[in-house]
């Protein structure tokens, strides 16, 4: 199956045509959900249609006995390069980043995979001029009832962009979180940040985090919905 699409505004050329939007997504070819890889599709318009890149996967994974790479999101670094953040079960996992020169799909330059420590596998960034913000799906309480494959607390943290993301010191500062006490749901998962089309903050004053809550037990699937939590950043950056 394929899932977890992430769309960004980014101009690239492919087979003599110019495209304005890119989509990265997870693709898996096994019933046990191992061997996940990251694919690429492109479009001239945000609404599509999206054309699958014919040299996929963009980020490959060889081992069929492990989960692989996926659940990606992109920050547009400049007119030629993206920063691709994703979950990985390589030695650099569980959360990684690559810089990829992607403005010409006939000449892609895939940067080395960098480990980003101190964050959970399901983490998603947004940039401002001074800071990088990160929402992460975490497991705070024991997860015993189904759905056991998602977490219970979505955490929001930040660090200055001057700090090394791959550094060996945990510089992440928590702003807040959305957990069972805040939402009324035992599961809170798959968070993301409201950004512009290139992955940057819309305002320095507030941050909107989206996430999915769920009930536990047999009705978990029918309880999925989209919620949001708004954080006032003025109180954190006086």
Please report, for each region that a protein language model flagged, where it lies by residue.
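Beta-rich carbohydrate-recognition and catalytic domains
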Residues: 1-3, 8-67, 75-121, 126-186, ...
């Amino acid at each position: 199956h394929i899932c977890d699409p992430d769309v960004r505004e980014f101009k690239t050329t492919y087979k003599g045509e110019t495209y304005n939007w890119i989509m990265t997504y997870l693709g898996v070819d096994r019933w046990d959900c191992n061997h996940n890889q990251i694919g690429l599709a492109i479009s001239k318009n945000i609404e599509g249609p999206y054309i699958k890149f014919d040299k996929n996967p963009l980020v490959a994974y060889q081992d069929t006995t492990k989960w692989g790479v996926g659940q990606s999101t992109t920050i547009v670094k400049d007119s030629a390069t993206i920063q691709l953040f994703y979950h990985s079960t390589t030695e650099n996992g569980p959360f990684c980043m690559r810089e990829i020169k992607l403005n010409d799909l006939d000449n892609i330059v895939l940067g080395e995979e960098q480990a980003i420590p101190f964050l959970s596998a399901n983490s998603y960034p947004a940039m401002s001029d001074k800071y990088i913000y990160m929402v992460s799906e975490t497991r705070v309480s024991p997860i015993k009832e189904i759905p056991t494959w998602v977490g219970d607390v979505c955490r929001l943290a930040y660090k200055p962009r001057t700090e090394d993301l791959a550094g060996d010191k945990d510089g992440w500062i928590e702003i807040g979180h959305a957990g069972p006490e805040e939402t009324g749901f035992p599961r809170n998962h798959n968070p993301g940040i409201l950004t512009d089309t290139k992955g940057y903050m819309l305002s320095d004053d507030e941050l909107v985090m989206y996430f999915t809550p769920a009930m536990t037990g047999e009705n978990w699937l029918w309880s999925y919905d989209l919620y949001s939590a708004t954080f006032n950043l003025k109180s954190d950056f006086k």
